[in-house]
Amino acid sequence: MNFSKLFALVLLIGLVLLTGQTEAGGLKKLGKKLEGVGKRVFKASEKALPVLTGYKAIGK
């Protein structure tokens, strides 16, 4: 494995993320999308978990 190329790629990505934008516009949008995904997963698990626990209780 060529670690120098991998290190250069990681460094380049880090520089783009940290210095590419002076305001948090793009990163804020990404954060909002991730937050929305988390909320949807949480709501879906709230709906599914009681069904699964009820199914396990019936199987006993």
Swiss-Prot record:
The modification Isoleucine amide is found at residue 58. Residues 1-24 form the signal peptide. Transmembrane segments: none annotated. Its main location: secreted. Pfam families: Cecropin. GO terms for cellular component: extracellular space. It is found in: Secreted. The keyword Signal applies. Keywords: Amidation, Antibiotic, Antimicrobial, Immunity, Innate immunity, Secreted, Signal. GO terms for biological process: antibacterial humoral response; defense response to Gram-negative bacterium; defense response to Gram-positive bacterium; innate immune response. The keyword Ribonucleoprotein does not apply. InterPro entries: Cecropin, Cecropin_insect. Cecropins have lytic and antibacterial activity against several Gram-positive and Gram-negative bacteria. PANTHER family: CECROPIN-A1-RELATED. Belongs to the cecropin family. This is Cecropin-B type 2.
